[in-house]
Amino acid sequence: MALSFVMASCVKTKTYRVNDANRDWFADSTNCNFAMLDDNGIQQSFRFAPADSYTTETGASILFVIPTDKGEHEHITQSGANSYGTIRVSTTISAYKLMGGEYSDIDELRLYFNEAVYVLGIERNLFYPDSDNKYKCYESSTENAMEYSAEYIDSYTVSEKNYEGVMHLKLIDVAYPLTKNFPTEIYYAKHYGLIQCTLDDKLTLRRLPSVSKE
């Protein structure tokens, strides 16, 4: 008992924080409320809460009286929806950094968009994609897995406004019937968040440059 206490006191806590550059993927407070226009000329207003952070712990166990290091990992999250409640988006970036070696500085991004869950290792998959540039996207209600491509675009123009630093995700393998309003293509900009999306592979919404006053 005493030995376990002594060994536990030797456990070291290492703190992992989300990389500074990745904090820019969340919408600034002035960009949380906005409007989007779809192909049918229907305008929808969106509201997002300011980004918030929390921490979780990993490790800290004692195996065969040998203490393991404890990790404290930062997570930053931001959520919002349109006024109709038909589009819900939540973005979380986590400082896991558990794999070591060449993966030791990678933050994980999880983009929840209605029933879709896109998972991405930002530093690796977005800037140094695999040779086939194919990653897994999940449908949360069915757990069906599909493939999507990811790319980083230096700049992209939507509704005559230019955005710098844009993440482009596109579904490339639809093997199952999709749930309604499933996002098949997403453009996500630094400091702004969602700027364009295509639902059900047929209806596209584009962000308007003016900020909603609602």
Q: Residues of each region from the PLM?
A:
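Sec-dependent signal peptide recognition
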Residues: 1-2
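C-terminal motif of bacterial Sec signal peptides marking the signal peptidase cleavage site
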Residues: 6-9
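Conserved functional acidic sites
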Residues: 11-214
